[in-house]
């Protein structure tokens, strides 16, 4: 039995953010960010790009969340997007994330101008080290 607000398909508006149906395999959401108006949500899904992983965008339509598209991390087929922070201060959101290697992973960014937006590597951790999260900090 479905409960009120539960999605019935990938394109059905939902009161819940549900990454099921956004690719193949089991969805694996690991980080998220909402714009200040709570009308746009980004979910970092650590599946490979070929399986639907990347940064998924959802839009609030007034009744529920609707999947828009996935920003696929294609700089490496073996790397996935993990943690997530977003800057909504400009005309287009700028998203920052870490990748999922256990050593020598990356901090990446992408400006969301649509589903074909390209990622840029900002930093690579030294061998034996890894970035484990990402967040904004105020300047002193």
Model-derived segments and their meaning:
Residues 1-140:
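Beta-propeller fold recognition
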């Amino acid at each position: 039995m479905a409960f009120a607000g539960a999605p019935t398909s990938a394109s059905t508006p939902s009161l819940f953010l549900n990454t099921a149906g956004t690719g193949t395999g089991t969805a694996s959401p690991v980080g998220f960010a909402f714009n200040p108006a709570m009308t746009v949500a980004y979910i970092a899904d650590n599946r490979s790009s070929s399986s639907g992983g990347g940064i998924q965008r959802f839009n609030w339509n007034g009744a529920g969340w609707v999947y828009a598209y996935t920003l696929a991390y294609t700089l490496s087929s073996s790397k996935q997007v993990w943690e997530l922070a977003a800057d909504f201060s400009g005309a287009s959101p700028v998203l920052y994330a870490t990748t999922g290697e256990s050593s020598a992973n990356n901090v990446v960014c992408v400006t969301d101008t649509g589903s074909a937006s390209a990622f840029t590597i900002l930093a690579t951790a030294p061998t034996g080290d890894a970035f484990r999260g990402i967040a904004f900090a105020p300047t002193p």
